Amino acid sequence: HNDRAGEIGRTLNTKDFDLDRIFAKEGVQIIHLSGLISALSEETCNFCLELARAAKKNGTKISFDLNYRATFWKGRDKELRSAFTEIASLSDILVGNEEDFQLCLGIEGPEAGGKGIEEKIENFKEMIRRVKKTFPNASVFATTLREVVNSNKHLWGAIMLEGSNWHVVNPREINVLDRIGGGDGFVGGLIYAILKNWEPKKWIQFGWASGALATTFQ
């Protein structure tokens, strides 16, 4: 269950922002859009679409974390599939696992998840090969790899395709205090590394470390 009725974020509107200043005059390098916000309401769906269009028009790179949530999509599949597909077609960086790509974008692929980390890696690679054919504008695809041992012990890794090169941070054990925010930390670290013009293998390493820090920091 997810009750967000009355949340101020549901009313986000591009009319409240100076998009010309943000994208044209100040030249934002990357804008990150979340599938959670995109699916939050009809207003936020349009908000993210308009941001993506404005960013593309002005040469700003677009990062999109699909972040599928069944409670947000209930009864809205057609509307959200159309919006997510357009945003993904404009995006340079796509973040999500097999389930996200299947349910948000309708890309057929292997069964989400897998029995172990190695199978998850192979499933993700196969999915991205298919996604690239549908969304050729994107050049970076990434996701985290998580295997829960127990509530406080996880194996945490990450995988990324940049251009034609795969980069993997092999899962290692981390002591988790609160798993919430690990994915956001990962994306934040990934984007930071890209903005710093580090070599691609460091993008995924810094994203991994940022996500690990977010879940283990007291």
Region annotations inferred by a language model:
Residues 49, 53-57, 88, 208:
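Anion (oxyanion) recognition and catalysis
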Residues 71-164:
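Conserved phosphate/ATP/ADP-binding segment of small-molecule kinases
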Residues 17, 38, 69, 101-102:
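A generic structural signal for short hydrophobic patches within well-formed alpha-helices
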Residues 17, 45-50, 76-85:
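Charged helix-capping and loop-helix junction motifs
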Residues 62-64, 95:
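Hydrophobic beta-strand scaffold residues
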Residues 1-38:
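Conserved N-terminal subdomain of the carbohydrate kinase-like
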